[in-house]
Amino acid sequence: MKSAEIELKFPIADLNGLQAQFPALGFQLDTPRTFEQNTLYDTPGRTLRASKQILRVRSYGGIWTVTHKRPAGTAAVAEEIVAPAPRYKIRIETETTVEDGPALGEIFEQLGYAPVFRYEKFRTEWSQVTGSIDGPLFTDLALELPAPRPRSHLVLDETPIGDFAELEGPPAWIDATLAKLGIDPATCITESYGRLFLAWKKRTSSAAENLAFDEIPTGAEVLQASFS
């Protein structure tokens, strides 16, 4: 399935306190806290990264998913949605489930791609009915989208380097949700977990190569506690 993804992240200081607000705001719990592991693939010359694309294989709740993401790439999108740019992260996402993630990874490697980065987290998924999305963004991109998209999403990610929330939905809904949760828009970010990891490595001088619980001591403690 191909779709336009509009999202924004913000760091969380008190995950339980934030999550306690969700039911009163009309959010529904879709997926309880679940371990997620992601592997990014690229060429030896990092051609995907250079063009701001990702190729990812994800394991989440016993389901394997392959995803390709690329920039939206049209001036019309930027003018319509991002004010001021780059307020939101906007990408085109093509995604589908697969039966055997490791086998798909082997296929990628035979085609010249290699695993270049692994990142892990515990994710909790919530959603809220927000109606449908329409307008110039989706017309200009000429995407084959179903007419209604009734739910927008708020996910909580517990990573080895900290907790983050991610809002995905129409820009107006994102802004309204931030206000209802009391989140300062100035604290919001659009960086990927890969870039957040690199910034963390620079600050801490860590030798870790992946955003993984087994490579980051504090993360390893979280992992052990979660499965004990």
Name what the model sees in each region.
Residues 95, 166-168:
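Active-site scaffold segments
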Residues 15, 174-175:
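Short, well-ordered alpha-helical microsegments
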Residues 12, 168-169:
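Conserved residues at beta->alpha junctions
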Residues 59-61, 160, 171:
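A generic beta-sheet turn/junction motif
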Residues 172, 178-189:
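A hydrophobic, small-residue-rich beta->alpha segment in the mid-to-C-terminal subdomain
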